[in-house]
Amino acid sequence: MYTCGNRKVIPNMPDLILRKIFDQYDYPVLCKMERVCRRWTNIINSKFRKEIHEISIERLGSMFPQAHQCVPFRRLSISCPSDSHDFLAGVFRRSRLSFMKMTTDINFLAGIDQIHVSKDNGRRYFSNVEDLWLLMIHPDDDVTQRFLAIEGTLFSELQQLTLQVHVNPRYYKNVGEIVKSFILRYPKSNINLELHAEKSMHILNQISNLPSLPLYKIKLICTDFDQPQLRLDQLYAVMREQNIQAKNITMRDWSLFADGTTPVSYNPLDTFRISSCSIETVDNLVKSIQMTASQGTHVDGVPPTKKKKVIRKKKETEVVTEEGVLPKPKKKVVKKVVKKKKPIAFIKKLEVAGQCTLHGLTFLQQKAHTELERRLTTLVPGLDVDCSEIYYCW
């Protein structure tokens, strides 16, 4: 019988009572309590499977293993050194098959074979994960090759995939190969791409090394404090050349330059978001957005063909009665109405948020965004302009 101090713990208490007791303890304590007996192990592991559907693994800068469970969000946050294989093996043993959402880095997935996981040869490591947030910082040649060799055994079917890339000029090609492997393996997933870099040149070079892919969202984030320039015409050119289509585009912490003669996108956009940016030329940005909206096209990019009206004639038949032949019935004309397909809005929404500087309208101070809204709604009537989240520091 298990003893704790001078008190004796009776392991054959009803399951309901044990669950009430286990609810009072956090994750590290429960991991110790599961060693009491097999029955306690089964109850605690069942509790973990119900309460942990998301895992976040952070292995950068951690000196010793830590685990924190957030029960309301059904999340388990792990921070541990890169060589904590036994610690991670215990975490996966308890609740690996209950994970539906995962946040981790490319180095962890590339070295997953070093962690002991009890599974069949034909099973995936995380067969129930549907949402993956993957961090890529230093995908060198060794990490890339190990990941490409094992990526087919990681997940069954991803529905949501977010790739956060900290751009490094030495790894342009490796990032492109990793992204390509995800596209080929999970063609039906919604892909979000985040690119973090100090200079726009690194962003553009990384995009030029990506394969052709449809994105739900692309987010370009500047990590330099001085807000270097990002030319929207150059971004348009490289995305068009690589055939990279994104439904939503977000810019953050850049100094944006628009030439006024190039659209901001060559494919239809749901949202174009400018967050905490300095807009160098407001007039040219308005012109570029107007050019983008003027690219409105029909469904599938082809105007609907005119269809001829279909007239169906009812067959004429003579009805003979005792009184003679009845008059022929009138002809029924059926007209098929063909509705014209409405053109698709090429850009539906523009969002301006955060601490933005609108050069050319700064004399209006805190009313600058209202003038931007007025110009855009005048030139592009169907555009939804949202500046509700903008703020000023003066």
From Swiss-Prot:
Q: Which residues form the F-box domain?
A: 7-51
Tell me if Nucleotide-binding is a UniProt keyword of this record.
no
Question: Does ATP-binding appear among the keywords?
Answer: no
The highest taxon in the source lineage is Eukaryota
- Per the UniProt entry, the disulfide pairs are none
Q: Which UniProt keywords apply?
A: Ubl conjugation pathway
This one is known as: Uncharacterized F-box protein ZK328.6
Per the UniProt record, the source organism is Caenorhabditis elegans
